[in-house]
């Protein structure tokens, strides 16, 4: 009887641990937050003349048809915005590689680099926006550490 109670306690404890870890890991997954991007959203960054577009500053990057190593080439991603039906990804405990793979699987174009937006104000030069594809904006703290596939 005592052994049965001990075994039952261990089983209940293990099930509790599995449930707790399951809840933790399911809540730590990223989620897409839909926002509408328009002129007023751009103006939230300040006067629209402050944003300057610098075309084709991205480095050339190797491309493999079967797959590619995003993880090695992505640093400090904070936000991804896509067009008028925007996807916003905030920096946190998520895997940027998995997010980009999911964006690709859902038909978003992240295959070409069009240029970089940056602030003219010197104090804000660290806030940069990488344009990937037609409408994809990725805000990153360090542009020098980021290389994208550049296809035309």
Curated annotation (Swiss-Prot):
Its main location: membrane. The chain crosses the membrane at residues 7-27. One of its GO terms (cellular component) is membrane. It is a single-pass membrane protein. The keyword Transmembrane applies. It comes from the Archaea. Keywords: Membrane, Transmembrane, Transmembrane helix. It is found in: Membrane. This is Uncharacterized protein MJ1483.
């Amino acid at each position: 009887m005592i052994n049965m109670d001990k075994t039952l306690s261990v089983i209940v404890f293990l099930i509790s641990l599995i449930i707790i870890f399951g809840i933790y890991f399911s809540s730590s997954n990223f989620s897409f937050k839909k926002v509408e991007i328009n002129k007023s959203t751009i103006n939230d960054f300040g006067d629209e003349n402050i944003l300057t577009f610098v075309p084709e500053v991205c480095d050339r990057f190797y491309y493999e048809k079967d797959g590619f190593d995003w993880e090695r080439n992505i640093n400090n991603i904070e936000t991804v915005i896509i067009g008028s039906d925007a996807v916003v990804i905030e920096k946190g405990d998520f895997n940027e590689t998995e997010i980009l793979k999911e964006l690709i699987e859902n038909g978003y174009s992240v295959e070409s680099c069009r240029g970089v937006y940056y602030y003219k104000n010197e104090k804000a030069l660290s806030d940069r926006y990488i344009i990937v594809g037609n409408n994809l904006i990725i805000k990153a703290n360090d542009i020098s550490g980021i290389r994208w596939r550049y296809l035309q």
